[in-house]
Amino acid sequence: MSDIHAKKFSKQSSIPGMKLIPGLILAAILTAISIYAGNIPWFINMGLGTLTLAILAGIIVGNTVYPLLKPYCDEGIHFSKHYLLRAGIILYGFRLTFQQIADVGITGLLIDAAMLSSTFFIAIWLGKSLFGLDQQTVILIGAGSSICGAAAIMATEPVVNAPASKVAVAVSTIVIFGTIAIFIYPWFYQLNEHYQWLPLTQETFGIFTGSTLHEVAQVVAVGHAISDQTENVAVISKMIRVMMLAPFLLLLSRYINHADTKNGRNHQEKTPITIPWFAVIFIAIAGFNSFNLLPAAIVNSLINIDTIMLTMAMGALGLTTHVSAIRQAGFKPILLALILFVWLMAGGLLINLGIQHLFG
């Protein structure tokens, strides 16, 4: 596009909200295509749900024509990926009730706690002793893998005072393996359903998905590709894990401040802590929905809006997932994230089955 068009667009974009429109339109187009394709029998039989198709379409466009559109669409895509995702998760509470949350119970809580702590400590141990990575990179990758992906990395960044380059590396590794997992998890579930290797029901697989996948959106995509029950349980399990971000950041901040004091590097200002308020509101909405105060028609409309928001967020996530991110991340961070990814799947499966056997 010419400089004249770019300047003209820049002037028009001075109007509040105008800069969001091109990106929102692009995300909406991907959403419409994905919803249509998601109802095609072939995709249904392949276990490719609407959200999975949205991120796949986003990746294809993101690595082909999107670089040309990015100057015009970037702000709207960023808005979709961050704010529509959180709004979608908040509205997801209208699909749930406290009774369903109680059904996950102590088992889901213990599994989430075990996965978070084990994954983070493995990241610290391997990252420092085996790969010799710096503490900031290790903590960022560990937080992203053990809690909630890019959101956890962005929340951890001010605590460790990491530069933008290290944040980008950590986010790249999380997005790469989280995206791969979107396709592996439904495939593994279908194989296990056929061969009956492990005693996994739709509910227990939902807990496994929520306790091991990186991003909230990825959890929704995997659960959606299997069944409504799996999706509901997976999101509940994941949101319990996301809620653990706040105490994790508090403990991490205290640890870093203690280490800095021990090493003679006192900070004059307290490290800011980011609390995932969208997770708190999600729980509040689920509680409100438990009382059945709204007519069913309104709740169904909110659920439809929620589906559109989440699909737009997944498309936006795909648009910003670039193949070049693998090269930018480097070998050691990628290898660390790969090992953590394998642990989340294999170790997570063992922890899930073990705790469910003891407390289920």
UniProtKB/Swiss-Prot annotation:
The chain crosses the membrane at residues 20-42, 47-69, 104-126, 136-155, 167-189, 239-256, 277-299, 304-326, 333-355. The keyword Signal does not apply. One of its GO terms (cellular component) is plasma membrane. It is a multi-pass membrane protein. Pfam families: Cons_hypoth698 (PF03601). It is found in: Cell membrane. Keywords: Cell membrane, Membrane, Transmembrane, Transmembrane helix. InterPro entries: UPF0324_pro, UPF0324_YeiH-like. Belongs to the UPF0324 family. PANTHER family: INNER MEMBRANE PROTEIN YEIH-RELATED, UPF0324 INNER MEMBRANE PROTEIN YEIH. This is UPF0324 membrane protein plu2856. It comes from Photorhabdus laumondii subsp. laumondii (strain DSM 15139 / CIP 105565 / TT01) (Photorhabdus luminescens subsp. laumondii).
